[in-house]
């Protein structure tokens, strides 16, 4: 969060004609998820929450900043309410804020996989192709609707930056030229 605050301070030039783009990533959450490390995932989530607070504080004061929070892909781990007493102590978490709500961490894929060479790998969770959560605040956040295909985050950001025909307040068809062939993509 401190690095994000400093980056915003360095990039923010009230006299500049154009704004700035800043991407912040929680780099270790993916590693923690692959390792089935629930404590690591929770710690990374807490850290990115602090980063988001810094970005939102700036956006609220600035009034012309779009903050988008999303993931580059989903993962198989979920932290969900648990009414089952059969969950092992290792996966049982207690929330200190409400005095003991029980949560459990579940991994939605097999605890093994096969690598590109055909070798059996263990202890690594998978990336599913599911939609990812997305949240936004500020101008253009009307294009951020709660969930989207992970590849569509590009269109949200490009529209906000007004790149390649993106429009403020709506998403148009995109055309990509490959050689002499034009392909239209729905955004």
Model-flagged regions — what are they?
Residues 1-185:
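A post-motif C-terminal structural segment
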């Amino acid at each position: 969060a401190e690095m994000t605050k400093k980056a915003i301070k360095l990039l923010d030039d009230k006299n500049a004609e154009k704004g700035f783009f800043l991407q912040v990533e929680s780099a270790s959450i993916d590693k923690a998820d692959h390792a089935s490390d629930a404590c690591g995932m929770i710690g990374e989530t807490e850290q990115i929450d602090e980063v988001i607070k810094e970005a939102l504080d700036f956006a609220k004061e600035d009034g012309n900043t779009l903050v988008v929070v999303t993931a580059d892909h989903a993962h198989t781990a979920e932290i969900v309410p648990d009414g089952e007493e059969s969950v092992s102590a290792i996966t049982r978490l207690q929330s200190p804020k409400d005095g003991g709500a029980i949560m459990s961490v579940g991994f939605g894929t097999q605890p093994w996989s096969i690598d590109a060479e055909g070798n059996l790998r263990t202890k690594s969770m998978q990336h599913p192709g599911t939609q990812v959560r997305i949240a936004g605040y500020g101008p253009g956040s009307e294009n951020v609707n709660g969930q989207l295909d992970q590849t569509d985050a590009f269109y949200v950001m490009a529209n906000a930056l007004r790149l390649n025909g993106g429009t403020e307040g709506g998403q148009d068809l995109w055309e990509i030229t490959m050689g002499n062939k034009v392909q239209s993509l729905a955004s």
